[in-house]
């Protein structure tokens, strides 16, 4: 159970008091909790604080008060921790109990690639007996939304744990056993010592407290628009006006009654404009003058402008260091939740790329494989013709039906069904990482979100790597996972769905997979906004850093959050025009390849760029409407003189979006985080770790009146959030500079030099910069540099003293049902004042947007680093360095940095107890040389190779696509996933059996060949295995055998949704062809039966007279007419046969398999949709056709009294 743990026993200390103060603005949540724990043991112990973090939160501050000690944390570069004797080394253990070959030192725990994202772990040192510990922790989070547009605030369980009705165990006893059932991921060992404690178990336990505790809760709401209501489904709440509120947009929520301790605390906010985009603004912590002086003291700015002091050069340097100066600039946040509830679901318009990953390892039993076969057949028949699909089986290696996802048509569907029918569990162990890498590196298809369906019954020993891989592609891929049997890894299955916003399903013994599969398919086929992008427009005098930069898709209830770090560069641009507009963003272009973001040339929209943008007034959004790329564009703002910042994260909506421009509280511009802003003396290192102590000057904090023994103040004037130790506390001195006692933060006078503590770097980093892009990787030392006294750096005398407000616009675009949609919202960004006002008060929440924006920017750099590393080993260093810079500057963790605990009173670092995975950051030259030495010389980075293997058991339709280390080119020129050594977990390395050209040619021939076989014959062969079984009648079938009653019929359905009227169809539904045709409402079908009989026997004169006297017509044309051709007659008969067979199939499903409607409802909906689009011949109507099919079973009851009549009113609109 998370919380404050005893290292020796793993037991959680009881919570005595919880005081939660939180703040919501738009979709952003700032939360600070004061948690007091009591040590009821008679013996001291080593304390460990464990705090779970969700996918959209980050820890931004931490302090712990233990008696007279204060423990905080500091962000450190993982690559430098070894050099600093912090004993943090790379690890390959992935959250399970450590393997024998990689032992963990006593008192150590491991975090794999996934756990370090979702767990915050801090060593608090020794806790004395009967001592209380108060922990202050601050987080910034992105809030989820509901389909109605409501914003959901759910308090973390660790801040408000439930209290069981009856607590029988004593305090201090060993922690309760985890609720999970996953022995593979969570282990079954007893936690008799801390070094054997598996932190993954903490995520699977319910957070409880053995007794009631004092609970306080306060939520301040600052909405971008008026609130339509605030409610809590769990508690009675009270709403009061905030003391500083200027309108009804700001209120304070508290609990009206005492907390009951039996449920979580949940608050729902209902905005008055729930489905309109809003832009909110949070100012930086520097004025224009302060930032000017800040720049003049930076080494990269001095070097960059030493030879070239032009305005263009200055703005270029500012642009390259924007990620380092995020706290100093204003941050804009875009919030948007589209209204998809009003979109009428249309299964036939369900677009997507459906990829099925099936575990075919030897652990799959014969029963499980048969269950998967039937479920996969139903799933494939439930897909719509507009989508793409592929099937991949994996074990030690993996095999795919197609080289890439193919369009859903008859030929591809028949081939896939044939492969599924012959699928067996014969592929060895379980290697999930390689097939996932192969899938995720495939190019995305426009308008088709990638939907991954993964079925497994086991576990892997690299769970962290698998989850982190899917997390990195969560913007483009959504995973629906299925766990079969008791041995499945619960953490793996749940994690895959959680990190990608999918869903997880588990099957116990005896359960059916089809209902759960169809349930997930229906979620995936819901209305979706794909290819969502955001385009920002700013004046020419503005530099911006934008996130996100990748396309995404939004399903019902999901929201979009975009960020922009905006820098006013008007002081550095001569003769600038505030009305001139340009577009720029963080995309890959050729224009500023060395910059952290990539501006485009000054340009406006072309006349044919679309008519989506209408006239926009200040502070008003426009209606969402389709865009026509061939129509002219008219903007209220001069677009030809604007600059656009693109973020390839789009969105589309269907409702009007008028709203007034909103910004965050203008009083929130004072300095934040006194602890972080206070400059601290360098920490001196000694050779012996146990005796290392660092002299730290905390007089600054004491002078400012902060009582460290009491912790931060959370309420009233002067309230503050806990913080991190400043980055000025370095382990090494720079050059031979003697340590100095840094004074308190002071206002800078004009001409004074300034060095930002978060940007302080060691001189060692300057020596290892890549030579190809020095300006991007310049890192400052802690040595204060005198600014260059140059008159050219003064502001233009012609410029006005008070800059005008920055007017910008955000354009949100996306695709919905192949229709392009767009919204736009304008906003006003007031520039920072030239002089800081004296009346501004501190705001403890004034960095929330900055934290979330920094987190988003860090993730972008991490993704870019991984992408570059796939292309060439070591080429990703520039993005790793940028991620570390941003992490340290904003006190937001990244995968390349780690939290290190610091005991301020003892003036020393606490021993870290966490063993981190190898992040790959800042690889040394020796490591690079060693890794490059393993590859072929002169051929660059090893790439992935597409291979073909002979398949066993006649499974010739599955092609093996194994990722291999080979110096040859990749399949379809797609770069392979990150360079990694092949181990048993990821499949054994295999030798190439043929040269690259021959292998690629064979692959193209195999996959590129088209089937020219007859569709009816293929379908009959695909269902041969089902039809060969005896089909019991409905009245005679047992509950266990009824599961396959409808499977043979479903297997005959065409990709379009229709059924063919042939012998296979008649055999499946057990109705003779003669009876089907005689009961048909189409005279042509009945006449064809008569004609056939006449061909079989000699006709009598009476029969000839009867036929000639009343000849039936087919759409007004006689079957015996000489003008009608045989081809037209056959086509008409085939069309009528399809119509009749399809409605009969629907009636048969309703009659004979009503108990399984949940499983075949998508199949029936597709068939019904196909019928409704057809033109019914002979003047018949669709209702007549369906009624006749239902009456068929009434007639059959007279013909066969054993048939049970079970009419079900099926409505495809309910699907």
Swiss-Prot record:
<feature type="compositionally biased region" description="Polar residues">
    <location>
        <begin position="646"/>
        <end position="667"/>
    </location>
</feature>
<feature type="glycosylation site" description="N-linked (GlcNAc...) asparagine">
    <location>
        <position position="132"/>
    </location>
</feature>
<feature type="compositionally biased region" description="Polar residues">
    <location>
        <begin position="990"/>
        <end position="999"/>
    </location>
</feature>
<feature type="region of interest" description="Disordered">
    <location>
        <begin position="595"/>
        <end position="674"/>
    </location>
</feature>
<feature type="domain" description="VIT">
    <location>
        <begin position="19"/>
        <end position="141"/>
    </location>
</feature>
<keyword id="KW-0597">Phosphoprotein</keyword>
<dbReference type="InterPro" id="IPR013694">
    <property type="entry name" value="VIT"/>
</dbReference>
<feature type="modified residue" description="Phosphotyrosine">
    <location>
        <position position="879"/>
    </location>
</feature>
<dbReference type="InterPro" id="IPR052627">
    <property type="entry name" value="VWA_domain-containing"/>
</dbReference>
<dbReference type="InterPro" id="IPR036465">
    <property type="entry name" value="vWFA_dom_sf"/>
</dbReference>
<feature type="compositionally biased region" description="Polar residues">
    <location>
        <begin position="608"/>
        <end position="621"/>
    </location>
</feature>
<feature type="region of interest" description="Disordered">
    <location>
        <begin position="1100"/>
        <end position="1121"/>
    </location>
</feature>
<keyword id="KW-0325">Glycoprotein</keyword>
<dbReference type="GO" id="GO:0005576">
    <property type="term" value="C:extracellular region"/>
</dbReference>
<feature type="compositionally biased region" description="Polar residues">
    <location>
        <begin position="964"/>
        <end position="975"/>
    </location>
</feature>
<keyword id="KW-0732">Signal</keyword>
<feature type="domain" description="VWFA">
    <location>
        <begin position="353"/>
        <end position="532"/>
    </location>
</feature>
<feature type="region of interest" description="Disordered">
    <location>
        <begin position="964"/>
        <end position="999"/>
    </location>
</feature>
<feature type="compositionally biased region" description="Polar residues">
    <location>
        <begin position="1100"/>
        <end position="1112"/>
    </location>
</feature>
<feature type="signal peptide">
    <location>
        <begin position="1"/>
        <end position="18"/>
    </location>
</feature>
<dbReference type="Pfam" id="PF13757">
    <property type="entry name" value="VIT_2"/>
</dbReference>
<dbReference type="InterPro" id="IPR002035">
    <property type="entry name" value="VWF_A"/>
</dbReference>
<dbReference type="Pfam" id="PF13768">
    <property type="entry name" value="VWA_3"/>
</dbReference>
<keyword id="KW-0964">Secreted</keyword>
<protein>
    <recommendedName>
        <fullName>von Willebrand factor A domain-containing protein 5B1</fullName>
    </recommendedName>
</protein>
<feature type="region of interest" description="Disordered">
    <location>
        <begin position="934"/>
        <end position="953"/>
    </location>
</feature>
């Amino acid at each position: 159970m998370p919380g404050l743990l005893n290292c020796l026993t793993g037991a959680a200390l009881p919570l005595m008091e919880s005081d939660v103060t939180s703040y919501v603005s738009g979709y952003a949540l700032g939360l600070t909790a004061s948690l007091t724990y009591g040590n009821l043991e008679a013996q001291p112990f080593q304390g460990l604080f464990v705090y779970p973090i969700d996918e959209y939160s980050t820890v931004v501050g931490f302090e712990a008060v233990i008696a007279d000690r204060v423990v905080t944390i500091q962000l450190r570069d993982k690559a430098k921790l070894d050099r600093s004797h912090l004993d943090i080394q790379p690890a390959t253990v992935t959250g399970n109990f450590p393997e024998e070959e990689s032992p963990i030192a006593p008192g150590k725990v491991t975090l794999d690639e996934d756990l370090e994202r979702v767990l915050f772990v801090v060593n608090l040192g020794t806790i004395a007996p009967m001592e209380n510990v108060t922990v202050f922790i601050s987080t910034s989070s992105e809030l989820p939304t509901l389909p109605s547009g409501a914003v959901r605030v759910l308090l973390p369980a660790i801040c408000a744990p439930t209290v069981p009705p009856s607590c029988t165990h004593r305090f201090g006893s060993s922690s309760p056993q985890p609720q999970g059932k996953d022995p593979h991921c969570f282990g079954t060992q007893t936690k008799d010592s801390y070094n054997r404690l598996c932190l993954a178990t903490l995520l699977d336990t319910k957070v409880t407290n053995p007794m009631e505790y004092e609970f306080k809760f306060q939520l301040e709401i600052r909405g971008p628009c008026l609130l339509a209501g605030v409610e809590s489904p769990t508690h009675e709440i009270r709403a009061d006006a905030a003391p500083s509120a200027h309108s009804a947009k700001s209120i304070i929520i508290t609990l009206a009654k005492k907390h009951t301790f039996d449920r979580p605390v949940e608050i729902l906010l209902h905005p008055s404009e729930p489905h309109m985009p809003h832009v909110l603004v949070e100012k930086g912590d520097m004025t224009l003058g302060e930032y000017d002086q800040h720049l003049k003291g930076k080494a990269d700015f001095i070097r960059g402008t030493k030879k070239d002091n032009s305005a263009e050069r200055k703005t270029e340097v500012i642009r390259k260091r924007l990620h380092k100066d995020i706290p100093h600039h204003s941050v804009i946040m875009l919030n948007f939740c589209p209204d998809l509830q009003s979109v009428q679901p249309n299964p036939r318009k369900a677009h997507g790329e459906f990829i099925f990953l099936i575990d075919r390892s030897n652990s799959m039993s014969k029963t499980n494989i048969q269950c998967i076969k039937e479920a996969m057949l139903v799933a494939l028949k439930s897909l719509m013709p507009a989508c793409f699909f592929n099937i991949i089986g994996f074990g030690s290696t993996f095999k795919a039906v197609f080289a890439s996802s193919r369009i859903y048509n008859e030929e591809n569907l028949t081939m896939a069904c044939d492969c599924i029918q012959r699928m067996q569990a014969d592929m060895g162990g379980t290697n999930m990482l390689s097939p996932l890498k192969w899938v995720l590196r495939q190019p995305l298809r426009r308008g088709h979100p990638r939907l991954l369906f993964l079925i497994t019954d086991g576990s892997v020993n690299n769970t962290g790597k698998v989850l982190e891989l899917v997390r990195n592609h969560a913007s483009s891929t959504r995973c629906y996972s299925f766990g079969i049997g008791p041995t499945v890894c619960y953490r793996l299955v749940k994690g895959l769905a959680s990190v990608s916003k999918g869903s997880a399903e588990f099957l116990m013994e005896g359960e059916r997979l089809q209902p759960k599969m169809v349930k997930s398919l229906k979620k995936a086929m819901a209305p979706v906004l794909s290819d969502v992008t955001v385009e920002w427009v700013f004046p020419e005098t503005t530099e911006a850093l934008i996130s996100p930069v990748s396309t995404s898709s939004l399903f019902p209830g999901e929201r979009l959050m975009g960020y922009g770090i905006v820098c006013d560069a008007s002081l550095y641009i001569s003769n600038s025009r505030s009305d001139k507009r340009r577009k720029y963003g963080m995309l890959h272009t050729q224009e500023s390849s060395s910059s952290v973001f990539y501006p485009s040339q000054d340009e406006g929209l072309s006349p044919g760029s679309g008519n989506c943008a209408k006239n926009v007034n200040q502070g008003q959004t426009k209606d969402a409407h389709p865009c026509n790329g061939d129509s002219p564009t008219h903007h209220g703002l001069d677009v030809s003189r604007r600059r656009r910042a693109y973020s390839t994260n789009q969105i589309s909506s269907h409702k009007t979006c008028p709203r007034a421009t909103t910004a965050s509280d203008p009083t929130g511009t004072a300095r934040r985080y006194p602890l972080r802003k206070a400059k601290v003396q360098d920490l001196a290192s000694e050779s012996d770790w146990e005796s290392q102590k660092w002299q730290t000057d905390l007089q600054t904090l004491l002078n400012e009146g902060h009582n460290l023994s009491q912790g931060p103040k959370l309420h009233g004037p002067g309230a503050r959030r806990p913080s991190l130790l400043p980055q000025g506390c370095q382990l090494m001195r720079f050059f031979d500079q003697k340590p100095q006692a840094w004074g308190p933060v002071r206002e800078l006078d004009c001409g004074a030099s300034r060095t930002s503590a978060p940007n302080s770097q060691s001189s060692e980093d300057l020596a290892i910069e890549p030579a190809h892009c020095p300006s991007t990787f310049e890192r400052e030392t802690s040595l204060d540099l005198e600014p260059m006294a140059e008159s050219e750096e003064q502001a233009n005398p012609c410029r006005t003293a008070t800059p005008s407000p920055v007017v910008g616009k955000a354009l949100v675009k996306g695709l919905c049902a192949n229709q392009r949609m767009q919204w736009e919202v304008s906003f006003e960004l007031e520039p920072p004042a030239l002089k800081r006002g004296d009346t501004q008060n501190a705001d403890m929440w004034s960095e929330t947007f900055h934290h979330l924006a920094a987190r988003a920017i860090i993730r972008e750099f991490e993704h870019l680093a991984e992408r570059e590393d796939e292309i060439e080993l070591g080429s990703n260093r520039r993005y790793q360095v940028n991620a570390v810079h941003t992490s340290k500057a904003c006190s937001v963790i990244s995968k390349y940095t780690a939290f290190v605990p610091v005991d301020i009173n003892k003036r020393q670092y606490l021993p870290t107890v966490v063993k981190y995975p190898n992040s790959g950051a800042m690889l040394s030259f020796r490591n690079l040389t060693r890794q490059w030495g393993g590859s072929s010389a002169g051929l660059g980075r090893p790439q992935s190779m597409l291979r073909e293997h002979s398949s066993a058991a006649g499974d010739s339709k599955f092609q093996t696509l194994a990722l291999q280390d080979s110096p040859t080119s990749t399949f379809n020129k797609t770069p392979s996933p990150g360079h990694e050594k092949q181990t048993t977990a990821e499949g054994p390395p295999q030798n190439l059996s043929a040269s690259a050209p021959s292998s690629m040619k064979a692959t193209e021939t195999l996959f590129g060949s088209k089937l020219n076989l007859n569709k009816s014959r293929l379908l009959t062969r695909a269902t041969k295995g089902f039809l060969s079984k005896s089909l019991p009648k409905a009245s005679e079938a047992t509950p266990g055998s009824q599961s396959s009653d409808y499977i043979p019929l479903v297997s005959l359905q065409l990709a379009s949704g229709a059924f063919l009227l042939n012998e296979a169809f008649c055999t499946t539904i057990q109705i003779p062809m003669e009876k089907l045709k005689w009961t048909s409402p189409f005279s042509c079908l009945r006449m064809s039966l008569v004609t056939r009989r006449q061909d079989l026997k000699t006709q009598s004169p009476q029969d000839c007279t009867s036929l000639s006297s009343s000849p039936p017509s087919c759409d007004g044309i006689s079957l015996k007419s000489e003008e009608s051709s045989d081809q037209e007659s056959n086509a008409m008969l085939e069309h009528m046969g399809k119509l009749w067979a399809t409605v009969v199939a629907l009636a048969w499903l309703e009659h004979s398999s009503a108990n399984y409607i949940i499983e075949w409802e998508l199949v029936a909906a597709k068939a019904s949709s196909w019928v409704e689009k057809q033109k019914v011949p002979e003047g018949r109507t669709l209702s007549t056709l369906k009624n006749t099919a239902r009456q068929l079973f009434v007639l059959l009851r007279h013909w066969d009294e054993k048939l049970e009549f079970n009419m079900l009113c099926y409505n495809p609109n309910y699907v």
